[in-house]
Structures are given as structure tokens and as C-alpha cells.
């Protein structure tokens, strides 16, 4: 059981690392909001099930849509304002802080810093706790490996090249009648959807949602370390980066 739960953490952090790999390592956007996007998706999914009675499938779709829309909108806005580098980082960091303030300031709805238990959709289907953990572990494995292979397949292709050009030399794209804002937004949409999916899967696999799991310290910083250890822009390397980060977390926790 411990190893299965550990793999849930690995899948979560590695997926966020893959999001950073695409949006920062390739598209050149310094973003500090992956945890907030994952948290937005997880909270929207969990709260809509709790307060509105939506089914887990509908709630999850709504959660992913919320996180994806938020991430895409912020990057699109930053690009329209021609913000670059640390300016984008500041904007997205403010969004992360706003997310945390929203969660902590609306305890009647979000239960504040304490968080709340999430109803496991697999338990509703009759699966036991250990069986559900195995399913989530397999889902996490498929998510991380599938995303890594998908991004690897994109690398070197036209869209990948346009993502990189949009981040490194947007003026060059404009001279070729291509809109860099469009390609930054597409990269943001893909990355945000990955983060949102990871956030929801993590919430269901742990059975709990709390703001600490989606904070800058617990999510964004490890995600950047995962991406950096994989060699920014290398999706396969991020899988190994996730192993290193998880090992470091466990070793420091035991000290």
C-alpha cells in the first residue's frame, strides 16, 4: 500500500514536470502556476461533486476544463501584453497566490487549510481500497509514460518547432505571418490539461484535497526540479527526474 501511494506522488510530480518541460523547456514561458492549475482542477471536481452532486466523470471533466482555461488564459494574456521571462513568472505566481487566498478565505465552501475528504469514484463502483490504489497506480503509470511518449513524438515536429520559436524569437514568427501568441496559448493549453488531469488523479488516489498539496513549494518547485533533471525539453528525462525528486523527498522526510 505504501509503495502504491508513493507511486501516486510520483505520477503527480512527474506529470507536473512534463507540463513544465513543454511550457518552459520548449515554449520558453517562465510559469509558476502548475500547482495552482492542478489544484483548481482538483477543487472544482471535488467541490462540484460534494456541493452540486455531479457524477465523478462530469465533475472531473469540469475540473480539467477549469484548470486548462485558467492556464491558457493567463499565458494568452501575458503574450498579448508582450510579457516575457520573469514578467510572466510574476503574473503566474500572483495567480498561484490568488488561488491559495481563495481557498483559505472561503472556508465555508472549500474547508480552508484543513481540506476535505474526496469520495473515491472507484469505491462507488464496489472496489476495495487496495484494489482502487492499484488502479490509480496503473492510471498514473499510463499517464506519465503516455505523456512522455506523446511529447517525445512531438519533438522535432513542426508544432514543437513553432512552440520553441514562439518562446525564443516571436518576432521571427511575426515576420513569417505566424502569430506567436497562438502557439504559446496552444502549448499552455496542453500543459494546463496535463496539470489538471494530474491534480484530479492525485486527489482521487489520496482521497483528500488540501491547498498544501498544490502550493508553490510542494508542486511548482518539485516540478521544475523534475524538468531540470530530465534536461529541460526532454520528456523522457523527466521520468527519471521524477524518481530522483521522489527519492529526495522520502530521504529528507526520514531524517
Predicted regions and their residues:
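Transmembrane alpha-helices and adjacent helix-loop boundaries
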Residues: 1-255
Amino acid at each position: 500500500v505504501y509503495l502504491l501511494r508513493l507511486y501516486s506522488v510520483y505520477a503527480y510530480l512527474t506529470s507536473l514536470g512534463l507540463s513544465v518541460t513543454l511550457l518552459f523547456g520548449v515554449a520558453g514561458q517562465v510559469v509558476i502556476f502548475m500547482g495552482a492549475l492542478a489544484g483548481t482542477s482538483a477543487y472544482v471536481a471535488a467541490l462540484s461533486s460534494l456541493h452540486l452532486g455531479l457524477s465523478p466523470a462530469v465533475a472531473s471533466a469540469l475540473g480539467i476544463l477549469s484548470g486548462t482555461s485558467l492556464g491558457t488564459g493567463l499565458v494568452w494574456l501575458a503574450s498579448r501584453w508582450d510579457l516575457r521571462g520573469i514578467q510572466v513568472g510574476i503574473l503566474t505566481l500572483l495567480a498561484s497566490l490568488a488561488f491559495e487566498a481563495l481557498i483559505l478565505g472561503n472556508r465555508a465552501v472549500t474547508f480552508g487549510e484543513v481540506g476535505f475528504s474526496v469520495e473515491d469514484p472507484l469505491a462507488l463502483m464496489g472496489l476495495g481500497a487496495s484494489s482502487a490504489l492499484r488502479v490509480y497506480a496503473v492510471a498514473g503509470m499510463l499517464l506519465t509514460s503516455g505523456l512522455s511518449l506523446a511529447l517525445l513524438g512531438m519533438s522535432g515536429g513542426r508544432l514543437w518547432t513553432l512552440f520553441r520559436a514562439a518562446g525564443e524569437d516571436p518576432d521571427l514568427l511575426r515576420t513569417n505571418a505566424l502569430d506567436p501568441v497562438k502557439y504559446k496559448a496552444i502549448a499552455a493549453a496542453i500543459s494546463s490539461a496535463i496539470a489538471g488531469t494530474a491534480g484530479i488523479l492525485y486527489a482521487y488516489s489520496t482521497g483528500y484535497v488540501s491547498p498544501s498539496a498544490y502550493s508553490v513549494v510542494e508542486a511548482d518547485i518539485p516540478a521544475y526540479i523534475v524538468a531540470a533533471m530530465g534536461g529541460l525539453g526532454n520528456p523522457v528525462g523527466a521520468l527519471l527526474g521524477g524518481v530522483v525528486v521522489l527519492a529526495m523527498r522520502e530521504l529528507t522526510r526520514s531524517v
